[in-house]
C-alpha cells in the first residue's frame, strides 16, 4: 500500500510541491523570499478580511469607520496596523525576490518570470486601491492624481478616467468599486501565485551557481521547509517590531486628516514602495511621456531574458555585471528619495538623471558588461 501523501489526488499535489520536491542543494537565503511572499499574502488576506468586517466603503463614513476600528474594535488597532504595514513588508519581500531573480539570472525561466511581472502589476494595483480606502487626504488626492494619468491616453483618455471614477470626480462610486476590487484582487493574486509555482516546478529552481543541478538534488522537506521556517520567524519578528513600536513609520501623516476635495495637500505622493516609479513619472515634463515611462519602468523587467548576453547565467562570477547591478540598486534608492521630494531644483535634475541611469543600466550597461565578460574569458 502506498503512503497516502503519494496516492491521494489532493495531498499528492501538496507532496509534489512542498514535500518530495527535488530542490538544488545549494540555494541560499535569497531563495526564501518566495515563501515569505506567500506568508505576506496570507497575513494580508486574513487581516484584510477582519478589517473589512468593520469598514464601510462610503465617503461619509469610511474615515470614521477606520477610526472606529482603531478605537473601539477589540485589537482593531493591531489588525489595521498589521494590514497597513503588511503591505510595506510585502513590497520589501517583492523587491528582494525580483532583485535575486535579476542577480542570479532566474529570468531565463521565461514563463515563471512573465507570470511574476503580471503578479507585480496586480500587487501594485491592489496596494494602490487599498491606499485609497481610509479616505484620508493622501488617499483622496493620490487616487485623483494617479487615475488622472489615464487621461493622457489619446482619444479615449478622458472617457476612460470618468468611467473608472464612475462620475465627474473621485467620489462615492470610486471608493465603492475600489473596495470591491481591493477585496477580490488578493484571491486572484493567490491563484496566479499557484500558476507561478506550477511554471517554476516544470523547470525546477535555479541556484546561485547558475548551472544545472539535476545531479545534486535534495527533498524540499525537511531541509528547505525548516529553512523557510527560520525565514518566516525572522520576518515576523521584524514585522511585529514595526507594527508594535513604529506603526506609522511607513505611512503619511496627511492620511490622518479626512479627505477634503477643496484643500490640496502641498506634496502629493504615494506610499514609499511606489516612489521610485513616481520619480520616473515626474522626471518627464510631458504627461503621456511620463505615463509611458512609468509603465515601462516595470515592464522593462520583461526585457531581461532578451538582453542576457553572458555565457554564464548568474552574476556570481561576473564582477563587471555586479558593479552595474549594484549601481542599479543604488539608483533605485536615489529615485525613491527623489519621489518623496518636492518638484524643485536640485531634485528635478537629480530625478531626471537617475531615471536616465535606470533605463541605461538595464538596457545598455548590463548587456554590454555581459558581452565584455565573455570576451575577457575568451568564450
Swiss-Prot record:
GO terms for cellular component: mitochondrial inner membrane; respiratory chain complex III. It is found in: Mitochondrion inner membrane. SUPFAM superfamilies: a domain/subunit of cytochrome bc1 complex (Ubiquinol-cytochrome c reductase) (SSF81648), Transmembrane di-heme cytochromes (SSF81342). A ubiquinone binds at residue 201. Its cofactor is heme b. Heme 1 (or BL or b562) is low-potential and absorbs at about 562 nm, and heme 2 (or BH or b566) is high-potential and absorbs at about 566 nm. This is Cytochrome b.
Amino acid at each position: 500500500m502506498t503512503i497516502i501523501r503519494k496516492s491521494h489526488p489532493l495531498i499528492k499535489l501538496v507532496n509534489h510541491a512542498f514535500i518530495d520536491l527535488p530542490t538544488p542543494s545549494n540555494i541560499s537565503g535569497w531563495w526564501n523570499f518566495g515563501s515569505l511572499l506567500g506568508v505576506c499574502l496570507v497575513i494580508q488576506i486574513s487581516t484584510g478580511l477582519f478589517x473589512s468586517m468593520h469598514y464601510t466603503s462610503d465617503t461619509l463614513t469610511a474615515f470614521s469607520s477606520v477610526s472606529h476600528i482603531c478605537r473601539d474594535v477589540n485589537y482593531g488597532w493591531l489588525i489595521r496596523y498589521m494590514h497597513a504595514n503588511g503591505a510595506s513588508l510585502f513590497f520589501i519581500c517583492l523587491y528582494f525576490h525580483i532583485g535575486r531573480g535579476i542577480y542570479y539570472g532566474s529570468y531565463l525561466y521565461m514563463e515563471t518570470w512573465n507570470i511574476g511581472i503580471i503578479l507585480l502589476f496586480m500587487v501594485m494595483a491592489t496596494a494602490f486601491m487599498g491606499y485609497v480606502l481610509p479616505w484620508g487626504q493622501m488617499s483622496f488626492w493620490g487616487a485623483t492624481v494617479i487615475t488622472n494619468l489615464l487621461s493622457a491616453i489619446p482619444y479615449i483618455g478622458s472617457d476612460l478616467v470618468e468611467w473608472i471614477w464612475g462620475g465627474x470626480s473621485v467620489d462615492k462610486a470610486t471608493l465603492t468599486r475600489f473596495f470591491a476590487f481591493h477585496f477580490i484582487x488578493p484571491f486572484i493574486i493567490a491563484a496566479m501565485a499557484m500558476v507561478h509555482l506550477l511554471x517554476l516546478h516544470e523547470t525546477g529552481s535555479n541556484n546561485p551557481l547558475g548551472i544545472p543541478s539535476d545531479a545534486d538534488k535534495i527533498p524540499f522537506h525537511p531541509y528547505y521547509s525548516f529553512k523557510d521556517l527560520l525565514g518566516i520567524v525572522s520576518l515576523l519578528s521584524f514585522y511585529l517590531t514595526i507594527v508594535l513600536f513604529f506603526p506609522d513609520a511607513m505611512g503619511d501623516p496627511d492620511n490622518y486628516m479626512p479627505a477634503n476635495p477643496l484643500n490640496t495637500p502641498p506634496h502629493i505622493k504615494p506610499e514609499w514602495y511606489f516612489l521610485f516609479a513616481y520619480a520616473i513619472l515626474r522626471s518627464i515634463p510631458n504627461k503621456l511621456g511620463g505615463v509611458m515611462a512609468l509603465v515601462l519602468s516595470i515592464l522593462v523587467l520583461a526585457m531581461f531574458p532578451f538582453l542576457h548576453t553572458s555565457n554564464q547565467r548568474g552574476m556570481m562570477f561576473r564582477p563587471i555585471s555586479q558593479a552595474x547591478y549594484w549601481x542599479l540598486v543604488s539608483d533605485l534608492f536615489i529615485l525613491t528619495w527623489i519621489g518623496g521630494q518636492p518638484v524643485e531644483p536640485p531634485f528635478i535634475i537629480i530625478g531626471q538623471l537617475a531615471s536616465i541611469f535606470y533605463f541605461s543600466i538595464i538596457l545598455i550597461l548590463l548587456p554590454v558588461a555581459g558581452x565584455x565578460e565573455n570576451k575577457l574569458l575568451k568564450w
